[in-house]
């Protein structure tokens, strides 16, 4: 065992546990703070908050490409035109159908309700008086339910060229007309997906068409039917159809700094919300709300100089003007760039339109200090750092946007007892910390002072928040997670303090954090709120709450998550036929075919590694945290490496020839040959690695490249593979630059193979070096696979999404490449493969198999001529390929549609599947 110097941020885990225990065991009066203050950053291994790979990095490049729709549609059509290998073999969706968090497993104490994949969009059918007919959009497709989420019919499969749904709407003038906007654009690396435009159905979703005259843009953020047409807000501006979806045309908005003409920047017309005044349904208001606001782009110009509100009183193209009242969407706690992502909603007051706005602060995302910083910290207690909060505030206008009244700020939104974000501000997080990612608002159609909005949690009014001045009062009705249960979770995993009986004091389980959509349906007895978040969809019918007011509570939410919509980064089939999963924002777990996933670990699941023992497997979370279970998930043990500067998805792999041999990498490469006997000792107070059996084999250190500001860029691992003693580490420099940094990224491999006169050894520094990597393009490597017949031959797949602002001819369009000299030189095998993201690669019986954003493809070792593998896959991104120990079952991670399996019915010699970054 090697004793390690302390590298990570020091914080007393015991203080976290003590605070959790105090918050959990001390009932608090209504309106009081939920927990005592805790000093310091979040403990390195406390994976209870999903960071979404941080917003302050380069988002996918094709967001900025106005031809994204054309590109993605072209990729899909090219994929569909390729011949099919194994045409008689169909892919099978094996599940999981939702996810449970039972108390008998380590994370059960967190008390999450049954969940699924991210809920991104929703619309109710106004013709159904029961409120039960609802359309929901996820990362993996569109579904309709006529029984409030008990059962579903999937829509659009076979027609949607990309199935991630950013918005859905029904036209009340033509109720059978359904509009589905593909593409989700939150400006995160894990939560975004490019689309192929808007699809239209005229029969309630039974059949669909894609108008040739369509939108251009990465994602669809809003679809709003009006009396004059259906407006679509996208990442590339505003569009409208006036012929029931037969065609769409661009609507000009005066988004330059003077508001006299459209701004020309790639991000300058990012429409985050579109609403129509409810009485006549003609006056249309649009929020241009790029989360980054006026941050300078690679060309030195503001990304979005005209964030704010725009209106056409007649709902017509060519009639939109800047709404001067936008300047009122600020307050002393906001920065000088106060308008970022904005959500709008109208109330239905009988005598005048009431407009609400939930506004993210672009300046805070760009790490500016609030304009009134002299009072911050003395009157509000608000953190000035970029992780404290990103929320500007909640506003109400009683004159249709001419003036605004501030109704809530991050400081005024107080947590409730046993609610997870109650102690986060002291750890560097605050309410609204992800307002660029979590941001929606809805108004009670019976009372325009009763408002509901989603950030990390869902809030509702608890007192009249009408036209009178002063801040309103709000309470949380969907909590982040259960503080009392988190204490027990820490006790289970990290020797914390167990929580006593909690239900009598704190009520029912949490649904899930990170709220994306909320819609209201009328019911015979009141209203129903449908919400979508990173854990799926939930519903609740209104009932008397505070002082008889009709609303919602934390305890009676009903899940709607009996569908296969989880978003796996990694999957593996165990010898007993069960599957283990690593899921976006839903941890790691296991399930049987056709069953429900059982949650075992928390955070973002990143890697899942199966062994020959069906009761022993490994699960990892963001930041290279690694656990092992040896009793089928009932208990887990921490055995993480002590990597230098681990990334969100730093790779961890297992040697297919020796499952005791594990390799992990970030800036450095570490190995262990002890498998389940590997131990890692953590400081009980600081939660840092003080001793471990992991040995450092190689530290790539500084690259020869610099950022635009002149800082030396460090190498960091993007992907790994191992076979015997041979290890390849795909490295990247400048892969995660800030948005305004125009520097090209660089990539290569380091390895212990190919050094003259040197024989590689497991867990040894011998022979390690950085290969030349000649021929590699300026894009990130996503996966590595060693040829099982020749360890000097290595295959890589590459990512499309890099280098914003650069011509693709400069960065390179290669997606699959091979080196036959241990990484010194690479040649292109892409051939006729669609040039979307290629995410994973393996070999089976001498055939290459590649996972891409357009499906699974195969070709001979020499590449070039690719075919589709099998039939029946949905149009979603495939993140991972995994062969079971026999080589008979190929299992894939279909992002947004769960786990799929192809049964070859024969054994095979294989390579390891490699391990990339998952995105």
Predicted feature residues:
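Intrinsically disordered, low-complexity segments enriched in polar/charged small residues
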Residues: 9-13, 27, 401
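Low-complexity, Pro/Thr/Ser/Gly/Ala-rich linker/spacer regions in secreted
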Residues: 905-918
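Beta-propeller blade termini and top-face loops
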Residues: 36-908
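Bacterial N-terminal signal peptides
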Residues: 14-24
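N-terminal export and membrane-targeting signals
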Residues: 2-16
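C-terminal region of N-terminal signal peptides and the immediate post-cleavage residues
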Residues: 22-39, 916-919
């Amino acid at each position: 065992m090697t004793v390690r110097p302390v590298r990570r941020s020091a914080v007393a885990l015991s203080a976290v546990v003590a605070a959790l225990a105090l918050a959990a065991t001390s009932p608090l009066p209504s309106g009081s703070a939920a927990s005592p203050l805790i000093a310091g950053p979040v403990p390195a291994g406390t994976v209870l908050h999903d960071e979404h790979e941080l917003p302050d990095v380069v988002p996918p490049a094709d967001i900025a490409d106005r031809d994204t729709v054309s590109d993605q549609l072209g990729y899909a059509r090219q994929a569909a035109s390729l011949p099919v290998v194994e045409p008689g073999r169909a892919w099978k969706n094996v599940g999981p159908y939702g996810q449970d968090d039972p108390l008998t497993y380590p994370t059960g104490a967190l008390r999450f309700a049954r969940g699924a994949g991210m809920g991104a969009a929703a619309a109710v059918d106004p013709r159904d008086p029961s409120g039960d007919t609802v359309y929901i959009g996820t990362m993996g497709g569109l579904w309709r339910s006529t029984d409030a989420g008990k059962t579903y019919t999937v829509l659009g499969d076979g027609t949607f060229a990309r199935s991630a749904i950013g918005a859905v709407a029904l036209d009340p003038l033509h109720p059978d007309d359904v509009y589905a906007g593909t593409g989700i654009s939150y400006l995160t690396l894990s939560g975004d997906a490019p689309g192929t435009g808007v699809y239209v159905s005229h029969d309630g979703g039974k059949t669909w068409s894609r108008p040739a005259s369509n939108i251009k843009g990465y994602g669809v953020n809003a679809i709003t039917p009006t009396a004059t047409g259906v407006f679509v807000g996208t990442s590339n501006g505003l569009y409208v159809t006036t012929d029931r979806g037969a065609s769409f045309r661009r609507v000009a908005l005066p988004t330059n700094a003077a508001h006299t003409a459209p701004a020309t920047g790639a991000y300058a017309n990012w429409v985050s919300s579109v609403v129509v005044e409810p009485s006549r349904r003609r006056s249309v208001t649009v929020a241009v709300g790029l989360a980054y606001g006026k941050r300078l782009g690679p060309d030195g110009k503001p990304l979005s100089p005209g964030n704010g509100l725009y209106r056409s009183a007649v709902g017509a193209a060519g009639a939109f003007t800047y709404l001067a009242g936008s300047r009122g969407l600020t307050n002393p706690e906001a920065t000088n760039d106060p308008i970022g992502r904005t959500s709008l909603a109208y109330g239905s007051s009988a005598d005048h339109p009431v407009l609400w706005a939930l506004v993210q602060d672009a300046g805070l995302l760009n790490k500016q200090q609030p304009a009134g910083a002299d009072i911050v910290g003395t009157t509000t207690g608000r953190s000035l750092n970029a992780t404290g909060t990103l929320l500007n505030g909640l506003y109400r206008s009683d004159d249709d946007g001419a003036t605004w009244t501030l109704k809530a700020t991050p400081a005024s939104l107080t947590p409730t007892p046993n609610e997870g974000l109650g102690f986060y501000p002291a750890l560097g997080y605050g309410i609204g910390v992800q307002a660029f990612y979590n941001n929606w608002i809805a108004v009670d159609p019976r009372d325009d002072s009763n408002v509901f909005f989603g950030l990390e949690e869902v809030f509702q009014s608890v007192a009249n928040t009408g036209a009178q001045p002063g801040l309103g009062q709000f309470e949380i009705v969907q909590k982040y997670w259960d503080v009392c249960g988190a204490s027990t979770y820490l006790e289970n995993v990290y020797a914390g303090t167990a929580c006593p009986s909690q239900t009598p004091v704190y009520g029912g389980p949490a649904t899930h954090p990170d709220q994306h959509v909320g819609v209201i349906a009328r019911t015979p007895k009141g209203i129903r709120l449908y919400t979508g978040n990173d854990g799926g969809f939930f519903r609740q019918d209104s009932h008397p709450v505070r002082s008889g007011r009709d609303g919602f509570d934390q305890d009676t939410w009903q899940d709607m998550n009996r569908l296969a919509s989880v978003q796996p980064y990694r999957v593996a089939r165990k010898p007993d036929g069960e599957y283990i999963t690593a899921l976006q924002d839903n941890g790691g777990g296991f399930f049987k075919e056709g069953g429900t996933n059982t949650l075992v670990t928390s955070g973002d699941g990143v890697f899942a590694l199966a062994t020959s023992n069906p009761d022993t497997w490994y699960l990892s979370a963001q930041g290279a945290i690694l656990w092992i279970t040896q009793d089928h998930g009932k208990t887990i043990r921490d055995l993480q490496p002590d990597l230098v500067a681990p990334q969100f998805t730093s790779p961890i792999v297992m040697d297919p020839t020796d499952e005791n041999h594990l390799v992990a990498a970030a800036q450095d490469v570490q190995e262990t040959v002890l498998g389940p006997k590997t131990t890692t000792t953590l400081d009980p107070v600081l939660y840092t690695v003080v001793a471990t059996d992991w040995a450092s084999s190689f530290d790539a250190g500084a690259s020869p490249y610099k950022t635009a500001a002149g800082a030396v860029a460090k190498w960091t691992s993007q992907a790994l593979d191992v076979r015997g003693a041979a290890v390849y580490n795909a490295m990247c420099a400048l892969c995660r630059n800030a948005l305004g940094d125009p520097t090209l990224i660089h990539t290569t491999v380091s390895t212990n193979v190919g050094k003259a006169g040197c024989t590689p050894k497991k867990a040894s520094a011998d022979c390690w070096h950085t290969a030349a990597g000649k021929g590699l393009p300026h894009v990130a490597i996503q996966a590595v696979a060693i040829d099982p017949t020749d360890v000097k031959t290595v295959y890589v797949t590459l990512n499309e999404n890099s280098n914003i602002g650069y011509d693709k001819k400069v960065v390179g369009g290669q997606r699959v490449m091979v080196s036959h000299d241990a990484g010194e030189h690479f040649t292109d095998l892409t051939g006729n493969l669609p040039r979307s993201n290629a995410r994973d690669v393996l070999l089976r019986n001498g055939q290459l198999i590649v996972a891409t954003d357009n499906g699974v493809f195969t070709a001979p070792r020499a590449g070039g001529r690719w075919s589709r593998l099998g039939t029946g896959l949905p149009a979603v991104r495939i993140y991972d390929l995994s062969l079971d120990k026999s080589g008979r079952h190929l299992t894939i991670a279909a992002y947004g549609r769960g786990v799929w399996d192809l049964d070859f019915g024969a054994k095979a010699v294989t390579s390891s599947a490699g391990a990339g970054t998952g995105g």
